[in-house]
Amino acid sequence: MCIGIPMQVMAIEPGYAVCAGRGERRRVSSALVGDCQQGDWLLVFLDSARERIDALRAHEIDATLDMLQAALLGLDASEAQPRFELPSAMAREDLAVLSNSRDSSSY
């Protein structure tokens, strides 16, 4: 399983973006996502921007990574709640939108 890190673009260089996220700064390739602007949010894996995301999605991913980190550290995460709606709590129609499916009857 691959885990992307949400990072915000702080500066632009030709073919690269200097990004900050989860307490670190990285120079990442922007070849897969094209031109970036300062303030954009990117999903980064192996020092390469893989996807453009919005601020809400970045915060959802950060919250999920925080929960995962707490569990890995053995902290009591039994009462941890994500700051977004889990797919298991969504209606069929919402799942269809989430998965870009046109037919929600298969859910």
Curated annotation (Swiss-Prot):
SUPFAM superfamilies: HupF/HypC-like (SSF159127). This is Hydrogenase expression/formation protein HoxL. GO terms for biological process: protein maturation. It comes from Cupriavidus necator (strain ATCC 17699 / DSM 428 / KCTC 22496 / NCIMB 10442 / H16 / Stanier 337). Belongs to the HupF/HypC family. Possibly a metalloprotein. It comes from the Bacteria. InterPro entries: Hydgase_assmbl_chp_CS, Hydrogenase_HupF/HypC. Signal peptide: none annotated. GO terms for molecular function: carbon dioxide binding; iron ion binding. Keywords: Plasmid. The gene is hoxL. The keyword S-adenosyl-L-methionine does not apply. It holds the Pfam family HupF_HypC.
